[in-house]
Amino acid sequence: MTHEKSCGAIVYRRYHGNIEILLIKHINSGHWSFPKGHVEEGETEVETAQREIKEETGIDVIIDPTFRETVQYFPRKDTQKVVVYFIAKAKNYDFFPQEEEIAEIKWVDIGHATTVLTYENDKSIVNKAKKAIRD
């Protein structure tokens, strides 16, 4: 069994009195999710999340390590993948998609994010993040 680990975050901003989160659409599969990527040797989970968000979107973030949610799934029969998600406040709002991987990026009102997200695991995490961001 192969084990893979990725880290990412629900990136948010406060915009005109609302909370919006950043969603990305992947080129290969066409699914909507959060920015994330594989942990590189010597990196912490937080460092991985920051690097991947910057690479995929061009946005710098402040990670809140007190919010840490994990998702586990099997992308292939012999592979278990664990994804660690944090919440992260955007320091800048203009995005620049990583053209090799990202088809589209958009800011979405957190209350409507579950209608855009593809996977149920992501919808569950955004509901938990919603509470953490508002508290």
Predicted regions and their residues:
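Short small-residue beta-strand/loop micro-motif enriched in glycine and branched aliphatics
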Residues: 31-34
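Unchanged
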Residues: 37-128
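Conserved N-terminal beta-strand and adjoining loop/helix that marks the start
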Residues: 1-20
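Generic C-terminal helix-cap and adjacent flexible tail
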Residues: 131-135
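Short, acidic/hydrophobic/Gly-rich beta-strand patch recurrent on exposed beta strands
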Residues: 22-25
